[in-house]
Amino acid sequence: MRTLIFGKGYLGTSFAASPLFRGSLLSGVDITDKAKVREEIQRYRPQVVINCAGKTNLEWCRDNKMEALEVNVAGPLFILHVCAELDLPMVHMSSGCIYEGKGAGGRGFSEKDTPDPKCFYSKSKALADELLTQAQYSKLLILRLRQPFSGASNPRNLITKVLSYQKLITSPNSMTYVPDLISATAFLLKDNQRGIFNVCNEGFISPYEIAVIAKKLFKLSQKYTPISKGELDILNAKNNREHRVDTLLNIKKLLATGFKMAKVKKRVKDALKTLSRSLP
């Protein structure tokens, strides 16, 4: 499938490197420039367009609100407009960070739950989802992922981030193994699925649990201190950092399509083993 991928960051490069999207074009054009978006799509003539572009740094979004809205909201709408004109399927990478908590009965938030964003980044992602959905384009697929990780040595990789901290929260979270996200995207496109899907691995895990597994696997001397979410909130407020959310997402809708999603703890171990091969 000839695919045009917007965004040369962690997700975009991961998609482009996958055999499932072999031959795709990875574009770094400014998605806030509608003319450039149209030119890129018309030049490459893809069969599907995937938007992985976006601003994800919470503090940057808070301090640069207009720019954050341009990239996280206006940009995806420009891509949608051109895709609709050319009758092309569009996949938009969204975020589960538009929720906080465990959802009804502790089973995680479903795609139908009303977003309750707690920081400006989350607000921009929730707004984009709302406006994209209200456009009622029949070939739109929105995927909500959460704390993406893999075996890649990349500063955006959740595992890389976790291992760089000394204090880590013990509360469980939903997380997304990037190779599984890519597989799910290919599956959903082939199955002609549309609408919003939560795409996370089965089960939940805390950042502290990841560090404990890594410490044992790598025989690390680094000490990791477990802290509560409340303690993290106090530290972030003290250091003028944006609010971080704990979020559980429900993936029943995804599983109902027939896609098989691996357990998150297994994928964390898989990612750590892959990452260990790149260590000196």
Question: What is each PLM-predicted segment?
Answer:
Residues 63-91:
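NAD(P)-cofactor binding segment of oxidoreductase domains
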Residues 130-183:
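NAD(P)-dependent short-chain dehydrogenase/reductase
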Residues 191-239, 276-280:
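Mid/C-terminal beta-alpha module of Rossmann-like enzyme folds, strongest
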Residues 262-280:
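Amphipathic terminal alpha-helices
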